[in-house]
């Protein structure tokens, strides 16, 4: 698409010329810019970002939706140093860091958040519409660009087929064969993927994405049966066999199969829970131009295809498929899903989060 071509062309020309001297005024105008037009075009944004020279990201594991390659590609392309803090942090950790480091040069410039945490912190975000904003479905973005969904997937169960039988449903996980083997990716009151796991359990047990009481009850039963592990799973625990069953997004579970050949991904049919993560700019970003250039890169064809390469479903997939710019091989390799996905609304997520905050610890501890 034209945007991607423009980014590449401008990056090449600015790499051969010195950054603008007036970095102070550039930073000031970038902090209030709501689109690239406010800065006089993409070339001005690139120059301002290169003058800042740095971008602070947080809670982006290298193996999560291909963020390792995404960060490297962005840094190499624009000559900007990307500081990646707390790669294994939760969405709430991102917000906590922004609050604790406010006014400091190492505060997060951008956020990548689970929907429940994002909804509770909209006041911290700076509105910005990327050049490809029109390609993003209306229900997956704030009209002003205060937050925008970026990539998504479906909640799944990953399991080591060499250590446990293949589950046919969530109910199977309550069986003795899974004793001490099931892990949830994080604390659902803080982490988006764990929150999705509870919502999936609610759907599978007669609840809804809003009424998640049955999901909380399910994990309480898992805990009582001795099947739920008090361990946050990652690649190391999966490969070592410490966490042979993991609730997580399908793109994360599927990526583990490249390192452990016996690792399989199961998306329960009939209870398909879909969710997108949320991209936003910290309104107090110490590098406001770099933060906005990062957004332009992520929502370009190049950035979207890099997410797709990591098994995630980019938010512009439909528009890119129509335009013929999507990576067809990576798109065809996505895990197959049966049934109509349920994608929670803001209100449903807020109500579910409220119930979870009041009841999770009592049920699971």
What are the functions of these language-model segments?
Residues 273, 277, 281-341:
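Mature extracytoplasmic/periplasmic domains
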Residues 152-156, 216-221, 227, 260-285, ...:
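Periplasmic-binding protein-like
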Residues 24-42, 50-69, 277:
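Extracytoplasmic "Venus flytrap"
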Residues 323-365:
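Extracellular/periplasmic bilobal clamshell ligand-binding domains
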Residues 12-29:
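Bacterial lipoprotein signal-peptidase II cleavage site
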Residues 1-14:
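Sec-dependent bacterial lipoprotein signal peptides
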Residues 56-71, 83-99, 105-242:
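Extracytoplasmic ligand-binding site segments that recognize negatively charged/polar headgroups
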Residues 116-122, 239, 244-262:
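A ligand-binding cleft/hinge motif common to bilobed small-molecule-binding domains
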């Amino acid at each position: 698409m034209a945007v991607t071509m423009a980014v590449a062309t401008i990056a090449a020309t600015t790499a051969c010329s010195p950054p603008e001297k007036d970095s102070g005024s550039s930073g000031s105008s970038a902090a209030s810019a709501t689109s690239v037009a406010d800065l006089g075009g993409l070339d001005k944004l690139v120059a301002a970002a290169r003058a800042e020279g740095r971008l602070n990201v947080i809670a982006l594991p290298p193996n999560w939706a291909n963020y390792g390659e995404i960060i490297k590609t962005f840094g190499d392309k624009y000559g900007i140093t990307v500081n990646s803090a707390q790669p294994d942090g939760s969405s709430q950790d991102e917000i906590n860091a922004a609050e604790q480091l406010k006014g400091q040069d190492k505060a997060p410039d951008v956020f990548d958040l689970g929907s429940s945490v994002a909804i509770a912190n909209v006041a911290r975000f700076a509105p910005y519409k990327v050049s490809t904003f029109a390609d993003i479905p209306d229900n997956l973005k704030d009209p002003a660009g205060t937050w925008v969904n970026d990539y998504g997937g479906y909640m799944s169960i990953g399991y080591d087929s060499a250590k446990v039988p293949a589950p046919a449903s969530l109910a199977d996980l309550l069986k003795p064969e899974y004793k001490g083997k099931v892990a949830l990716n994080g604390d659902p009151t803080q982490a988006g993927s764990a929150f999705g796991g509870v919502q999936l359990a609610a759907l599978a047990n007669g609840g809804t994405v809003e009424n998640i009481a049955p999901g909380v009850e399910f994990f309480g039963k898992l805990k009582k049966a001795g099947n739920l592990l008090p361990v946050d799973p990652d690649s190391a625990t999966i490969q070592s066999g410490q966490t042979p069953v993991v609730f997580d997004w399908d793109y994360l579970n599927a990526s583990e199969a490249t390192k452990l050949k016996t690792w399989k991904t199961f998306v329960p049919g009939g209870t398909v829970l879909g969710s997108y993560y949320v991209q936003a700019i910290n309104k107090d970003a110490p590098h406001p131009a770099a933060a906005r250039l990062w957004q332009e890169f992520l929502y370009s064809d190049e950035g979207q295809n890099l997410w797709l390469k990591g098994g995630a479903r980019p938010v512009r997939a439909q528009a890119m498929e129509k335009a013929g710019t999507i990576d067809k091989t990576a798109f065809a390799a996505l895990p197959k899903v049966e049934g109509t996905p349920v994608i929670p609304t803001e209100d449903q997520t807020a109500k579910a989060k409220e119930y979870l905050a009041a009841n999770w610890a009592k049920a699971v501890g």
